[in-house]
Curated annotation (Swiss-Prot):
Residues given in the record as heme b binding sites: 94
Annotated GO CC locations: extracellular region; hemoglobin complex
Keywords: Disulfide bond, Heme, Iron, Metal-binding, Oxygen transport, Secreted, Transport
UniProt similarity note: Belongs to the globin family.
Broad class of where this protein is predominantly found: secreted
Start and end residues of each Globin domain: 1-141
Protein name: Extracellular globin-1
Organism (species): Metaphire sieboldi (Earthworm)
Segments passing through the bilayer: none
Length: 141
């Protein structure tokens, strides 16, 4: 259950790791480096944005865009109507691109690992697990 307290914690913790241009760039690079290292079979999905080179401007921009999408959803976690509209928008984009539902599970696992690295003992994994489950369910094609 992604209740009010969990939503607040997720928003607050996300703000700690993903605010400001430097934090966003650093977080994105760390996330995608680990994600594609753990899932080399998925590099081909990012061919259009030079996924074989996560340091390329094309991939850097794409990586930030993906995480900015997550940022936009987390930012409205406590605004039910806007949250629903944002999820529907992202679902349409991912359906159009043929994104497989299981990719969201892989993404979530990696996200939790990176958040744990960044936040240490302050990471509320239960809050993230419950709220990310709602987010992923709303976006999965």
């Amino acid at each position: 259950d992604c209740n009010t307290l969990k939503r607040f914690k997720v928003k607050h913790q996300w703000q700690q790791v993903f605010s400001g241009e430097h934090h966003r760039t650093e977080f994105s690079l760390h996330f995608w480096k680990e994600f594609l290292h753990d899932h080399p079979d998925l590099v081909s999905l990012f061919k259009r944005v030079q996924g074989e080179n996560i340091y390329s401007p094309e991939f850097q921009a794409h990586g930030i865009r993906v995480l900015a999408g997550l940022d936009s959803v987390i930012g409205v976690l406590d605004e039910d109507d806007t949250f629903t509209v944002q999820l529907a928008h992202l679902k349409a984009q991912h359906t159009e691109r043929g994104t497989k539902p299981e990719y969201f599970d892989l993404f979530g696992t990696q996200l939790f690992d990176i958040l744990g690295d960044k936040l240490g003992t302050h990471f509320d994994q239960a809050a993230w697990r419950d709220c990310y489950a709602v987010i992923a369910a709303g976006i999965k094609p």
